[in-house]
Regions:
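Nucleotide and nucleotide-moiety/phosphate-recognizing core
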Residues: 66-72, 94-111, 118, 283
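Glycine-rich beta-strand-to-loop/alpha-helix junction loops that act as flexible
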Residues: 78-81, 98, 136, 264-273
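Glycine-centered tight-turn and secondary-structure capping sites
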Residues: 87-95
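Conserved phosphate-binding catalytic cores of ATP/NTP-utilizing and phosphoryl-transfer enzymes
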Residues: 109-131
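Glycine-rich phosphate-binding loop plus the immediately following alpha-helix
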Residues: 124, 147-191, 214-215, 219-223
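A contiguous, well-structured pocket-lining segment that forms one wall/lid of small-molecule binding clefts
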Residues: 185-264, 274-287
């Protein structure tokens, strides 16, 4: 089965052809990230306008790269929520029109389930049950995937998502958007123990909170500026990264230990962070 997938929940317009849910035949991404970077983050109105501008050509290229037409596609899938409402509407309406015109089934996909399912593309032998940490700009969830379409949320952020905290800390430190890669790059030359940042306490064993941690960094930087003292960007980036990644890894591994999960995976943009992957991998070996 060949499925045309369409994604437009944030600042990237994407389309892909996937075979049997495991093999990517083509994958095309059109992004407005450079334009968004001028504002230090995603501007919803700009994102929506760029989706409307890019989506037709993006889908056409995905089909062309796969050497297919809509006649070869068995279904159209589209992310329907959550996301920036204007951005989501562009993708959903385009997908609805395309599916109707081609006489193909339309499959709505939840954003978080899409993040989780991306692991099926890179881990061909992966199958439920498994535990997944979804960490992105809008979400920080620990999810038990009990079956192919059955999920149980064990924990989540009670305020800021991990990726959002990364972006705001990056902006405070004068690092470019997107914040995740920028903080990680700066952290390579820093001391992760240079700044003593707080460990947030939150109700719910697997829940997380990053608002206080983000605020602690902002206050540290502002206090130093008011006193005319320098802030070591590399050290602060490393200290923040170490704290937030330690929290995420600890919560995930604690859930894995308590549930007896035999497989643990990561999803979302923050999952690209090398330190987080190292912490989870090292900890998983001890379970």
């Amino acid at each position: 089965m060949y499925v045309l997938g369409i994604e437009s929940t944030c600042d990237e317009t994407a389309a892909a052809i996937v075979e049997d849910g495991r093999k990517v035949i083509s994958n095309v991404i059109s992004t407005s990230v450079k334009e968004q970077a001028l504002y230090g983050g995603v501007v919803p109105e700009i994102a929506s306008r760029r989706h409307a501008e890019y989506i037709s050509a993006t889908v056409d290229k995905a089909l062309a790269d796969a050497n297919m037409t809509m006649k070869d596609v068995d279904a159209v899938a589209v992310t329907f929520a959550p996301g920036l409402i204007g951005a989501v509407l562009v993708g959903v309406n385009f997908a609805k029109g395309l599916a109707y015109a081609a006489g193909k089934p339309l499959v709505p996909v939840h954003h978080l389930r899409g993040h989780i399912a991306a692991n099926y593309l890179t881990h061909q032998s992966l199958h439920p049950p498994f535990l997944c940490l979804v960490a992105s700009g809008g979400h920080s969830h620990i999810v038990m995937v009990e079956d192919w379409c059955r999920y149980k949320v064990l924990g989540r952020t009670v305020d800021d998502a991990a990726g959002e905290a990364y972006d705001k800390v990056a902006r405070t430190l004068g690092l470019p958007y997107p914040g995740g890669p920028s903080v990680a790059a700066a952290a390579r030359d820093g001391d992760p123990h240079a700044y003593k940042l707080p460990v947030p306490h939150v109700e719910g064993k697997y829940n997380v909170s990053f608002s206080g941690l983000k605020t602690a960094v902002i206050n540290e930087v502002h206090n130093a500026e008011q006193k005319g003292q320098p802030v070591n960007v590399a050290d602060m980036a490393a200290s923040f990264q170490e704290r937030i990644d330690q929290i995420l890894a600890k919560k995930l591994l604690s859930a894995a230990s308590d549930t007896g999960a035999k497989q643990v995976v990561l999803a979302g943009g923050v999952a690209a962070n090398g330190r987080l992957r190292q912490l989870v991998n090292d900890g998983a070996q001890k379970l």
